[in-house]
Amino acid sequence: MIPVVALVGRPNVGKSTLFNRLTRTRDALVADFPGLTRDRKYGRAFLSGYEFIVVDTGGIDGTEEGIETKMAEQSLAAIEEADVVLFMTDARAGLTAADLSIAQHLRSRQKTTFVVANKIDGIDADSACAEFWSLGLGEVYQMAAAQGRGVTNMIEYALTPYAEAMGIERQGEEEEVDERQYTEEEAEAEQKRLQDLPIKLAIIGKPNVGKSTLTNRILGEERVVVYDEPGTTRDSIYIPMERDGREYVIIDTAGVRRRSKVHEVIEKFSVIKTLKAVEDANVVLLIIDAREGVAEQDLGLLGFALNAGRALVIAVNKWDGIDQGIKDRVKSELDRRLGFIDFARIHFISALHGTGVGHLFESIEEAYDSATRRVSTSMLTRIMQMSQDDHQPPLVNGRRVKLKYAHAGGYNPPIVVIHGNQVSKLPDSYKRYMMNYFRRSLKVVGTPIQLRFQEGDNPFENKVEKLTMSQERRRKRALSHIKDRKTK
């Protein structure tokens, strides 16, 4: 499971600066969730080979009263759910009462914590950082987040204990990043193997949208004995089930928790828990409340799923009991605001009464099969050639862009790598045309498809040709002949 790093500290110590630097390293999707909290941000980051979720917390002013306020609860929740806490302080301002208060709270939680003395640029860092040892949280790490000094070393040190686990996880997900070039027979055999694997389904949505109701409806219909292994208080519940001969694992993010161990605010909605579920899933089922329409939180969650490249099914819940005028308005809003994901199936359901729930699994299975389908190199190259025959690539500087061959570059989501000359100069309109052509030809439904173009560089370009011995002799005779003619 991908580790979570929480940035904790009093206001203006550089949490947001570090957050922005970390998330920029991978063009990561960064989303604020209006209505959830105004001072907590989430992003995916990649640095020095480590992939992780980073959380920018806020709202802790360090006072005893401030720790207990509603405003601070979401930040405290981030600490509870994090694997690693970076406790950030201001080396220029020195140790404050707020720092001491936050440190006391962190010690009581017994979290893996690293004290970071930020803003060390232009000062005597060793001298300025000495007093932070009194926080009682171990070694003090020096950093200048704005300039990037010390950031990489800090992350490498903090995430080293997770390196082996992440390596094992990547091996376990080998089928999702498989770049082998299959023959027709190999692709068919691999596809058959994948049919026997359980489909991991994450059910996500904003608070009170009906996640628990839908989960219970699904399990009740199938009469499956549910077992859970909660582990720590931040783990989602994995529920195995079978439907129509196909095995599934439902990743429940609805908030099944040991209530005595966590804040009530965590029960309702945990973005971190949702992010982890999305990362671990094959297919994401996003639930939208029909009575509220498409909210900003829905778009934020949708962005997380798309950023992770997961197959997607959308369920509009609470469809029963609303009049036709509202239904027409909701459908119009879905077309307008979700037009960019026209590949995803949309279902209108009632989780409470079971209306339309059964049809969800047809789309879930369809999306999984599309996302994990193995396609041979010869098939992809044929489709690429047909797309060119139907619509020639444009001319660039008087020369036609030439596409040579295509092969698979990964799965979940499907990635097609196309090799050719001058492909970097292809206009976006032609790339979209090709993407849609591949989608129609492969009948890809419920998952984004990505095209990557690689330039077929001339291996002899800028290379001095080495002559053979016979060529060298002919060259000398020719030069001698030219020289003799000039002297006559």
UniProtKB/Swiss-Prot annotation:
For this UniProt entry, the molecular function terms from Gene Ontology, in alphabetical order, are: GTP binding; ribosome binding
Instruction: Return the CDD domains for the record.
Output: EngA1, EngA2
Q: Which residues bind GTP 2?
A: 205-212, 252-256, 317-320
Q: Binding of GTP 1: at which residues?
A: 9-16, 56-60, 118-121
Q: Name one GO biological process term.
A: ribosome biogenesis
Role played: GTPase that plays an essential role in the late steps of ribosome biogenesis.
The name this protein carries in UniProt is GTPase Der
Instruction: List the source organism.
Output: Shewanella sp. (strain MR-7)
